[in-house]
Amino acid sequence: MAEAMELGKDPNGPTHSSTLFVREDGSSMSFYVRPSPAKRRLSTLILHGGGTLCRVQEPGAVLLAQPGEAAAEASGDFISTQYILDCVERNEKLELEAYRLGPAPAAYQAPETKPGVLAGGVAAAEPEPQSQAGRMVFTDADDVAIITYVKEHARSASSVTGNALWKAMEKSSLTQHSWQSMKDRYLKRLRGQEHKYLLGEAPVSPSSQKLKRKAEQDPEAADSGEPQNKRTPDLPEEEFEKEEIKENEAAVKKMLVEATREFEEIVVDESPDFEIHITMCDDDPCTPEEDSETQPDEEEEEEEKVSAPEVGAAIKIIRQLMEKFNLDLSTVTQAFLKNSGELEATSSFLESGQRADGYPIWSRQDDLDLQKDDEATRDALVKKFGAQNVARRIEFRKK
């Protein structure tokens, strides 16, 4: 079963520590990301690493912007988005000040490049211009080298969105950038722009043609660099919807099990039956007395199998949150788990980085403390989360 779970993981999903952006005192680092094509990916990496996001610039939040943004560099208050990518790449928290954006030195003049000359081949490398944060920027030579390598070595569209091609590119010392940076550069800036460098089209295959047509229909999804779900062209619309629901149902269950394992670091049984229970309101959780009228047989039946309407409703809600906040399935399900399955609290957390009631989200250590038969520990949890939220958490874990 463990092997099956490993095989089921998304190879392109975040793999860095879930506490990468958590301070030593246990509080989460808060980030504000300026609108940009990379915002979705950065948000996913930040939330996966235990950080939080704010919709507006708040005191104490780390302000992120892409190098080259004039307003951000002029203010001197922004940190380069490369900080997130480098932290994730090294899986360690780096020094923020090393990535602070600011006006370029007056004496520095960027060397001029001629794309027409580079199109025939990559010229001898000159010292690369560096951003104020100390990170090398991509030159035209880098772009041509990346496009040429992809054209010659990518066997299919999936190899471009995977990791193996880019790791091999890094080992070949094609550029001085990391494979993550080159992959991000190609997917966000270079793919579909080959003609500007006087190069041929990207590798053509039936699958890449389908991906291209899909990208034309959904450009936002194409920018994300994420492979789209395959759609069987000959299936009637109704059958396709059923197939899609079935695929998403399996994905939701798989991601919840995966999220639970990462969040709680516990061993999952061979027949994992952990289901997310989305609380639609903030009323007190049901008490045993309120459930006493339910027959034992019915309870066992409900525990053994979740009804199709319930699954459909859960999938619909998760989809809505994914679309509303432009996040992936893993991030949304993690947020539900950390907020005891409460819809309002989860939505608020995804939007602002904190719950509407002002209480913190649940961590693995909090859940471990919750299992202790210790009155002092329980009182501390009540003080931290409030009696109502503690009761909800207990009920949520039972389910």
From Swiss-Prot:
Keywords: Acetylation, Activator, Chromosome, Cytoplasm, Isopeptide bond, Nucleus, Phosphoprotein, Telomere, Transcription, Transcription regulation, Ubl conjugation. Residues 10-101 form the BRCT domain. There is a cross-link at K114, K196, K210, K214, K242, K372 (Glycyl lysine isopeptide (Lys-Gly) (interchain with G-Cter in SUMO2)). Gene3D superfamilies: 1.10.10.2170, BRCT domain, Homeodomain-like. GO terms for cellular component: chromosome, telomeric region; cytoplasm; male germ cell nucleus; nuclear body; nucleus; shelterin complex. GO terms for biological process: intracellular signal transduction; negative regulation of DNA recombination at telomere; negative regulation of telomere maintenance; positive regulation of canonical NF-kappaB signal transduction; positive regulation of NF-kappaB transcription factor activity; positive regulation of non-canonical NF-kappaB signal transduction; protection from non-homologous end joining at telomere; protein localization to chromosome, telomeric region. It is found in: Nucleus; Cytoplasm; Chromosome; Chromosome, Telomere. Pfam families: BRCT_2, Myb_Rap1, Rap1_C. Residues 1-21, 199-245, 279-309 are annotated as: Disordered. Residues 281-304 have a biased composition (Acidic residues). The modification N-acetylalanine is found at A2. PANTHER family: TELOMERE REPEAT-BINDING FACTOR 2-INTERACTING PROTEIN 1, TELOMERIC REPEAT-BINDING FACTOR 2-INTERACTING PROTEIN 1. Associates with the I-kappa-B-kinase (IKK) core complex, composed of CHUK, IKBKB and IKBKG. Homodimer. Component of the shelterin complex (telosome) composed of TERF1, TERF2, TINF2, TERF2IP ACD and POT1. Interacts with TERF2 (but not TERF1) with its C-terminus. Interacts with SLX4/BTBD12. Interacts with TERF2; the interaction is direct. Belongs to the RAP1 family. This is Telomeric repeat-binding factor 2-interacting protein 1.
